[in-house]
Every structure is written in structure tokens, then in C-alpha cells.
Amino acid sequence: MKNPMLEVVSLLLEKLLLISNFTLFSSGAAGEDKGRNSFYETSSFHRGDVLEVPRTHLTHYGIYLGDNRVAHMMPDILLALTDDMGRTQKVVSNKRLILGVIVKVASIRVDTVEDFAYGANILVNHLDESLQKKALLNEEVARRAEKLLGFTPYSLLWNNCEHFVTYCRYGTPISPQSDKFCETVKIIIRDQRSVLASAVLGLASIVCTGLVSYTTLPAIFIPFFLWMAG
């Protein structure tokens, strides 16, 4: 049986991560034309390579399949609204992506290198060095990616593009980006100033709205749980 408290914490963490990276998604709209007009030299890419595209706050990952094709996980609201492949196979816009993150629907899809990178620089197999893990054979990596093509549930914390490529490349789905974000949240929670600030805000809400259950209980329990977590 799932722990309701853990589910609430998980949901809050995902929403915080989405908000903190909203500028990443929205800033991409200005670079869409640039990405489509960019040309990438793919002769040095090998089938099964991990392609890494650093962004402002997050890094996007994919598996190179050869012939200028990249398999990558993309949230997309259209997947929940239509089965029309002609519409869902078009390049995912930022609005589709953001709404897809919110409703947690995605697909592992194949796009051109240009559509995958959108004008950004591409790093190749950088994870091998940063994670210091032994990679599977490139052909095995590519085959794993191809087997996973299609619809998949999405989670910023537990099932994102980094989980996809690390599973294909190393056999284990991990996401250092998500882990780093969770650690940052833990540090904030453990900071006694956060407890004090939440207590002050809680008291202020009681003063402004009166002693009613929907303000009194959060004002008491939120500082208490933050204090206990610290």
C-alpha cells in the first residue's frame, strides 16, 4: 500500500521542479526556427551513442540510432487527446511539452538530430565520464532504445529522458539531475530559517483569515513537519 504522505511529497517535488524549469521550456520557443535551420555534422556519431543537449537548467538526452535519427523521451499532451499519428509525430511544441509534463504523458519517439537538439550544442557519451559507469555495447544500447519506442508514463523525478538513456546505456535507470534537485530541496527543508518562515506565514494567515481549520491546521503542521525533517 502506498504511503499517502510520500505521494504528496513526491507530487510537490515534481511541481517544484516543473516551476523551476519553466523558463527552460518557454525559452525554447524563441529558438525553434534556429533549431530547424541548424545543421549538425553526424559523421562522428555512432549508433548507440548517448547525445546530450545542455539547456539553461536541465539537460535533454537521446540515443543515436544512425541515419540522423535520435530516440528520446518527450512529454506531449496530444498523446492523451488523439491517436492521429500524423499530428503526434510532428515536432513537439513547448506548449505541448509543458502540458504533457503536467498530465504525465510522454512517448519515446524518433526525431532528426536537428529537431532533437533545436540549435543547441551536442555532447556525445558525456555520461560515461560523469557517471563512471561501464556502457553496454552500442548495438545493444540502440536495440534497447528501439524496443521502448512508443507511449510511456512520464515523471520529472522518476521517469524522464535521463532515466531512459541510462537504462539503455548502462542497464539501470538513474537520473542525477533529479537526485540533485531532491538534495537541494532537502537542504532547504533542513534550513531552520525555512521552518521559521513557514511559521511566520502560517501565523499571518491565521491573523488575516481567522481561526478556521483550513488555515490553522497547515499553520501548525507544516512548520512541525519541516522541523521534524530537519
From Swiss-Prot:
Cite the source lineage.
Eukaryota, Metazoa, Chordata, Craniata, Vertebrata
A single Gene Ontology MF term assigned here is:
O-palmitoyltransferase activity
| Record's subcellular location | Endoplasmic reticulum membrane; Rough endoplasmic reticulum; Endosome, Multivesicular body; Cytoplasm, Perinuclear region
Clinical condition linked: Leber congenital amaurosis 14: A severe dystrophy of the retina, typically becoming evident in the first years of life. Visual function is usually poor and often accompanied by nystagmus, sluggish or near-absent pupillary responses, photophobia, high hyperopia and keratoconus.
Q: In what tissue types does this protein appear?
A: Hepatic stellate cells and endothelial cells (at protein level). Found at high levels in testis and liver, followed by retinal pigment epithelium, small intestine, prostate, pancreas and colon. Low expression observed in brain. In fetal tissues, expressed in retinal pigment epithelium and liver, and barely in the brain.
Where does it primarily localize? endoplasmic reticulum
Which PANTHER family does the record cross-reference, listed alphabetically?
LECITHIN RETINOL ACYLTRANSFERASE
| Protein known as | Lecithin retinol acyltransferase
